[in-house]
A protein has these predicted regions:
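Hydrophobic alpha-helical segments, chiefly the membrane-spanning helices
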Residues: 1-329
Length: 329
């Protein structure tokens, strides 16, 4: 598509791009500050808050888009979108997070969630060998999501009892403070979503103006767009020295992508979800390899180390090279 850019159109595009950038920066600040307050006020570790509350908020836009697409009968690419998002979240965003800041936390906080994520990808790999994901298989994958929620609730109670901080060490929890932080959380999440959409739409327009091919725009903007909320949260968390919140958000968002959004699409559509040849041969295996490369060292060593960031970033680059070379994506 070729757009006729006039001076006023260019100014408007640049203005909206700048507004989008401001929205995601300030929204990210509010969002991470509020999430940190929730963790400190409740006594629940930031990793668990990141893996549940923050992940739910950052995946909500993708969930709504997927559900509405399924209601319109257009959920055929749900598996490709979910798997691609998980691979990008891990190979790009967790890579960035770990390279900038190693993450240390008790193994008990992330071990079960890491195993659930790897199990979800492995189960998906097995279920889709016949080129589709059936309704029954979708229900079975939803069971993994139920296990994730149950484990998160148990972990939250356990950590509260283990930490048992002094009451005066916690931030204020009066009505006004609670309302303020809930407002910051909701406003921050909404600003991130709005800002992401403005950046993608106007970034696409700018790319078209300078002659970038539509195929490249589509591939890059879709990939960036699905992971931008997690990326904004990660960058903000790094700036605020909250690495466990970032890693928790990525792991939680990945689990929700695979075990909630994708099965919901199949159930709403009312028929099996097709899996393309590239998905069976490359995308799902690559997703498993990249996630295993990120999580298994942490399970063994009890820490998300910086070298793991470089390692999974390298795996992601290899995946992209194979994809463009063998499948012409």
């Amino acid at each position: 598509m070729n757009l006729d850019f006039t001076g006023s159109t260019l100014f408007l595009v640049l203005l909206m791009f700048a507004v989008g950038l401001i929205c995601i920066i300030k929204g990210g600040d509010f969002f991470v500050d509020a999430a940190t307050w929730i963790a400190e006020a409740s006594g629940i570790p930031k990793f668990i808050i990141g893996a549940t509350v923050v992940s739910f908020a950052t995946t909500m836009p993708e969930m709504l888009v997927s559900v509405f697409s399924a209601l319109e009968g257009n959920a055929d690419i749900a598996i490709g979108n979910a798997v691609g998002s998980v691979t990008a979240n891990t190979g790009l965003i967790m890579c960035l997070s770990l390279i900038c800041m190693e993450c240390t936390m008790p193994r008990r906080q992330y071990a079960v969630k890491a195993v659930l994520l790897l199990a979800a990808i492995a189960v998906l790999f097995g279920f889709t060998r016949d080129g589709q994901l059936s309704i029954l298989e979708s229900v079975l994958i939803l069971v993994i999501f139920a296990c994730f929620i149950a484990e998160s609730l148990v972990a939250a109670r356990r950590e509260q009892s283990l930490e048992a901080p002094e009451q005066d060490a916690r931030p204020k929890t009066d009505g006004r403070t609670v309302a303020l932080n809930i407002g910051k959380f909701v406003f921050g999440a909404a600003a991130i979503v709005l800002g992401a959409q403005l950046l993608i739409d106007n970034g696409t327009a700018l790319a078209q103006m300078i002659g970038v091919p539509d195929a490249i725009i589509g591939a890059t903007m879709i990939a960036i767009g699905t992971s931008l909320p997690e990326l904004v949260t990660t960058i903000t968390a790094i700036r605020k020295k909250q690495s466990s919140l970032s890693v928790g958000n990525i792991i939680g968002a990945n689990i929700m992508d695979l075990t909630l959004i994708m099965p919901l699409c199949a159930l709403i559509l009312g028929k099996p979800l097709p899996v393309e040849r590239q998905g069976m041969l490359l995308d799902i295996p690559a997703c498993l390899v990249v996630c295993a490369g990120a999580l298994i060292p942490a399970l063994v060593q009890g820490k998300f180390k910086r070298w793991v960031g470089f390692f999974i970033g390298g795996l992601y680059i290899v995946y992209l090279v194979i994809m463009f070379t063998c499948f012409g994506a």
